């Protein structure tokens, strides 16, 4: 089998990226994967653009290495490519909500075993404009915090970086209000809210048990 690793070298604390050779070695030595290509992203939407160029049967599967943002990019690109190539996720971000929800392995041996079994499943994906989201779409209070936390803060503090910045933002967020118009099938209503979320899993922002 042939696979492509699309790796975000800036995700999370960079710990997984430093040990990526161990994951690749396990696949080569203990599965029927005999060809592995790697692609390191260089900036925003680079993973999307690489995945969008894929063609049917070019690879047997793709491995996305990064956090939730990287996963969303690559899924969007795969959908645009219409290649229907299966995607494996190697969580290497700060929070990794979607991988946690799916209970995906994060050690070389467990990841190897998952690939060896090669059991695929279909998942839903949400769309907003021309981008998809695998885990959550949100707006309102703290919804932009993922864009405000710097790479240096994530590397230094891990998930705690989001809470630190959240506390800093709290005073300006308290008075926030959105007027929402919601239409789903035959249901239509309006509501004022400080925050809204459309979730595809029960794990959001590092918190388990959020009802999708």
Which residues are covered by each model-predicted region?
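Glycine-rich phosphate/pyrophosphate-binding beta-alpha loops
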Residues: 138, 142, 197-212
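Catalytic core of DAGKc-family lipid kinases
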Residues: 41, 80-197
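Short Gly/Thr/Asp-enriched flexible loops that form oxyanion-binding sites at enzyme active sites
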Residues: 70-82
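Short, glycine/serine-rich, charged loops/turns that create anion-binding
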Residues: 10-11, 94, 202-203
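Hydrophobic packing residues within well-ordered alpha-helices of enzyme cores
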Residues: 23, 47, 74, 98-99, ...
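Short glycine-/acidic-enriched loop or helix-start segments at secondary-structure transitions
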Residues: 16, 73-75, 99-100, 207-208
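Glycine-rich beta-strand-to-loop/alpha-helix junction loops that act as flexible
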Residues: 9, 65-67, 90-92
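ATP/NTP phosphate-donor binding region
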Residues: 1-62
């Amino acid at each position: 089998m042939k696979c492509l690793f699309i790796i975000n070298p800036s995700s999370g604390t960079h710990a997984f990226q430093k040990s990526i050779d161990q994951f690749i070695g396990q696949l080569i030595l203990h599965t029927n994967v005999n060809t592995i290509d790697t692609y390191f992203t260089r900036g925003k939407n680079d993973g999307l653009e690489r995945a969008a160029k894929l063609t049917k049967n070019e690879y047997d599967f793709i491995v996305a290495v990064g956090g939730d943002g990287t996963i969303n990019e690559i899924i969007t690109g795969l959908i645009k490519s219409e290649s229907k190539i299966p995607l494996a996720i190697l969580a290497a971000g700060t929070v990794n909500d979607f991988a946690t929800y799916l209970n995906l392995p994060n050690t070389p041996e467990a990841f190897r075993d998952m690939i060896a079994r090669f059991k695929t499943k279909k998942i839903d994906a949400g769309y907003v404009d021309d981008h998809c989201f695998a885990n959550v779409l949100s707006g309102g209070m703290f919804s932009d915090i993922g864009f405000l936390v710097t790479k240096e803060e994530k590397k230094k503090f891990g998930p705690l970086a989001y809470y630190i910045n959240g506390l800093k933002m709290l005073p300006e967020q308290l008075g926030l209000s959105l007027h929402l118009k919601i239409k789903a099938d035959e249901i239509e209503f309006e509501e004022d809210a400080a925050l809204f979320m459309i979730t595809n899993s029960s794990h959001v922002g590092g918190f388990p048990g959020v009802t999708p």
